[in-house]
A protein has these predicted regions:
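Short, charged cytosolic
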Residues: 1-8
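Soluble catalytic domains of membrane acyltransferases
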Residues: 73-174
Length: 174
């Protein structure tokens, strides 16, 4: 019995059949159009939203939710929510196993992610994270007071901050 959640050997790119690549294109291209089209709409709305509302985002949060729900639908992934999402400001803690977690969590709640500062510079993902209001932190003790102030400011603005637990993206037994 394996200590990992994986039941068999992972396929390599060479083992993927032509039909798999066709599915990647048939699902991936529409998702890319939705995500980057949503980013354009999000940016245009934010241009008008920011001067009047500052860090509050009553319009662009809905764009993020619709983009994530639509993307999951296009990928053939359904979402099931148990319980009731927190309605007020506060902190949410979740495990993180893949990039799909971000879509699923954004699709079901109006949240802002807290991420390590390096994410802001990642190609593509950094752009999306910055646009959607991710809070970037430096994991250094010297920055703790500054980061506490940022968290306080965002919570007072009514934000719900989402923290991923550290190192949960690693598989067991690796």
């Amino acid at each position: 019995m394996s200590t990992s959640w994986r039941g068999r050997k992972e396929p390599t790119a060479g083992e993927l059949l032509l039909v798999n690549w066709v599915l990647v294109l048939l699902r991936g291209i529409p998702v890319a159009i939705v995500v980057f089209g949503g980013l354009i709409l999000h940016t245009v709305l934010r241009i008008f939203e920011y001067p009047f509302l500052g860090s509050r985002r009553p319009l662009t949060q809905y764009v993020t939710q619709v983009v994530c729900k639509t993307s999951l639908f296009l990928l053939g992934i359904s979402i099931s929510v148990e319980g009731f999402p927190m309605k007020e400001r506060g902190a949410v803690v979740a495990n993180h196993s893949s990039w799909l977690d971000i879509f699923a969590l954004n699709a079901t709640q109006k949240i802002y992610f807290v991420a390590k500062s390096e994410v802001a510079n990642w190609p593509g993902i950094g752009w999306l994270a910055r646009a959607t209001g991710t809070v970037f932190i430096q994991r250094k003790a010297l920055q703790a007071h500054k980061q506490k102030n940022i968290f306080t400011e965002r919570l007072l603005a009514g934000h719900k901050l989402l923290f991923f637990t550290v190192k949960t993206a690693l598989c067991l037994g690796a």
